Amino acid sequence: MSASLIKGSDVAKEIRSDLQKDVEDLKSQGVTPHLAVVLVGEDSASQTYVNMKEKTAGKVGIESTVKRLPTNVEEDELLRLIDELNKDDSVHGILVQLPLPYHIDEYKILNAIDQYKDVDSFHPVNVGNLTIGQKRFTPCTPAGIMKLLDSIDYDLNGKHAVVLGRSNIVGKPISLLLLERNATVSICHSRTKDLTEMTKSADLLIVAVGRPEIVTGKMIKPGAVVIDVGVNKVDDKLIGDVEFESAKEVAGWITPVPGGVGPMTITMLLNNTIEAARRCLNEQ
């Protein structure tokens, strides 16, 4: 068998078409959604991500501003910038591109962002709201994964979902979203014993560890849905955390890399920015 592809690029395009209409509606009421992105340093991958966010925002009519700071910027200066953006009523969403230089306290920076403008949903209050099912914003990559599952009408009720990776950005929040849909969730990590036994029991396997091709076809249950979150550059080629060629012969559905989860992450960031702008309009 050969797995059917879940093409995030196609799903994202459809969603952005709807987002464009939402932006037009907000503009007709005098509000232009505005995303401010803070980029610290010269990391090439971060610059690429920021450029993609800026370009995609423009396509749906969202205003975007990029604040670029040098690698050696003082933490206090970065905090002052965030405070300015928090107080700027024309800015609806604030995103600090990660990772940050080692001398800057990442938690302190993310905690400084106004929780109502925290479109990445990394603020401790928003993380807490997610755990009790009262989310203001859904973290972008997990939200994108759920949309991909919806695009194939995948019923999570009673399914065994295995999440490989326990990061605050993907692993933990996606597990909570899956629980909300009545999946039985197992989280695996570097200390998990009998990893293959766990992955082979998964009806849904989500891999987000940042290690090239760590999951092979032999580790996948026949017919399973496989969501590959990883993006790794190897020999100038982008590959996922799943060995695609062997996995596609076993899985029922699989996301490609690139063109799978990545486009969805940016699209859901824009969705959160629009939601933040809509909240501001409702409070006027």
Curated annotation (Swiss-Prot):
Family classification: Belongs to the tetrahydrofolate dehydrogenase/cyclohydrolase family.
Domain of life, source organism: Bacteria
InterPro entries in the cross-refs: Aminoacid_DH-like_N_sf, NAD(P)-bd_dom_sf, THF_DH/CycHdrlase, THF_DH/CycHdrlase_cat_dom, THF_DH/CycHdrlase_CS, THF_DH/CycHdrlase_NAD-bd_dom
Gene name of the encoded protein: folD
Family annotation (Gene3D superfamilies): Leucine Dehydrogenase, chain A, domain 1, NAD(P)-binding Rossmann-like Domain
Assembly with partners or alone: Homodimer.
NCBIfam families: PRK10792.1 (NF008058), PRK14186.1 (NF010783)
Reported function: Catalyzes the oxidation of 5,10-methylenetetrahydrofolate to 5,10-methenyltetrahydrofolate and then the hydrolysis of 5,10-methenyltetrahydrofolate to 10-formyltetrahydrofolate.
Name this polypeptide is given: Bifunctional protein FolD
Pfam families xref list: THF_DHG_CYH, THF_DHG_CYH_C
Pathway assigned in UniProt: One-carbon metabolism; tetrahydrofolate interconversion
Keywords: Amino-acid biosynthesis, Histidine biosynthesis, Hydrolase, Methionine biosynthesis, Multifunctional enzyme, NADP, One-carbon metabolism, Oxidoreductase, Purine biosynthesis
Positions that bind NADP(+): 165-167, 190, 231
